[in-house]
Amino acid sequence: MALVSAVPLDSRLCLCRTLFGLTHELKAIRRTIPNLGMCRGGKSIAPSMSMSSTTFVSSEDGVPRRIGGHHSNLWDDDSIDSLSTSYEAPSYRERADRLIGEVKDMFHLISVEDGVSTSPLNDLHHRLWMVDSVERLGIDRHFKNETNAALDHVYSYWTEKGIGRGRESGATDLNSTALGLRTLRLHGYMVSSHVLDHFKNEKGQFACSAIQTDGEIRDVLNLFRASLIAFPGEKIMEEAEMFSTMFLKDALQKIPPSGLSQEIEYLLEFGWHTNLPRMETRMYIDVFGEDTTFETPYLIRERLLELAKLEFNIFHSLVKRELQSLSRWWKDYGFPEITFSRHRHVEYYTLAACIANDPKHSAFRLGFAKICHMVTILDDIYDTFGTMEELELLTAAFKRWDPSSIECLPDYMKGVYMAVYDNINETAREAQKIQGWDIVSYARKSWEALFDAHMQEARWISSGYLPTFEEYLENGKVSFGSRLTTLEPMLTLGFPLSPRILQEIDFPSNFNELICAILRLRGDTQCYKADMARGEEASSVSCYMKDHPGITEEDAVNQINALVNNLTKELNWELLRPDSGVPISYKKFYFDIWRVFHYGYKYRDGFSVASIEIKNLVTRTVVETVPL
């Protein structure tokens, strides 16, 4: 359905006037809890949350409580213990290391002016193909220097009309130009999308023959991939995406099932923003080698594919140990007894593994899984199960930052409190080794902001108040929890994050604001109906409808989706703009975590219903190995 025009949502003007410097801050209501040292043990706490249109149960203390009806943990100890460790033998690592050396030699062969593997008629495309291949096969971390040298060479021949296949090609080439535009942008080179104007016909349209050969299809496939790396206001990229999408869908109706058709289907479905690196690697391993439109020597393809398979499988041995550690943590804090909540620690770990499969990033993967799990438990406590008085006690206990505060809490909250308390301190110790400064105070402020935001939403539920869109989104950017799930794991990575860099990528930077806003809006469009059924009236959809009387629910969702699309282009720019002073590699981890959540909301609320797409993701990326 077409977007209504009566109530346009412009991303720069309508995002609550908060993302772009126009402030109207929401003042959170706070109630002071008197002397937490005087706990009122045994007191029956009356429910004060709205019970309309939701399910509730009577707990052991006789208090009716709201529940979400979420399915249980899908991955027990037997599932984890059954994971393969057959590739942890030293011989596999030794073979992988030899292959890494051979691939480095192959990069060297294409770096000489007229080597065995290249010529002045194809050297630019060959370099781009090598860089693209190692990235999609998930082995690029071994070839950073080689990648930089290859792209520097390509960029030195870049023109306002793009490039040809080689430095001495007589004409520009769509495939090479599109692949170059995409790859150079993602690595921080300033390249204009106007190079694509030179591939239009006299009518100003992209045009290809009706025959649709494999070579031509791959040209357009790379055009599609490039079009997704769009910045605000780039009409040519919108045109390229529209044309290439239609072309590729038409091609799928004509070509037989093959690696090419599988690749097209995958990229049309996941694009870039929901395309997780390890997930793409698993697909690309299956189809790599079938592309013969670029005549790369068989030996190069063979070595790249073998290395990719080995690295994919070797990682599985590490996965098993990390998941066993995560499962012990989950049980040690009594999480299995919290039966009313979602338990998605294995799924969160998988998502982390899909964006960070370097063995040295174990702390990142486990930290991300733990924090996401705790944030999810807290979300279910604040949104459904907890009473208002319990929530006030929990919030105040966190702000006191004293383990003795748990004596005032209901039993089901005590383990959660200690898990958060211990996790912050453990992460701080790990981070201090890398960052050289104590992050406890910094992390506590982030957690306190989350608790305040949850309390605000709990009060809205309790009172039946429906806020304005502006009020809701300003609070919702915090209550989603994406800042927390990003911040602490990031601090355990191997690169230093100074206060100056944190200001550029963490709160209150525009980069962080965009991430938080997009995730809140995207999550709401997938969750708002289920949330309303549980008695949670406030969502970006319902609040937008309140602000615009007469608009239909469908049109409100369409307007929000359009806003998300515009904000996503702004996020692309914030990630890749060359004047930020922060290396793209630093921002890329933040961005990839955003992609993780974006993927989770692609089809539904995948964190509440994890038994479909995300279950398949776990199976494909961390359970199954690939045949050598």
UniProtKB/Swiss-Prot annotation:
Mg(2+) 3 binds at D531. GO terms for cellular component: chloroplast. The keyword Magnesium applies. It comes from the Eukaryota. Its main location: plastid. Its EC number is 4.2.3.-. Belongs to the terpene synthase family. Tpsd subfamily. This is Monoterpene synthase like 1, chloroplastic. It comes from Pinus banksiana. The gene is TPS-mono1.
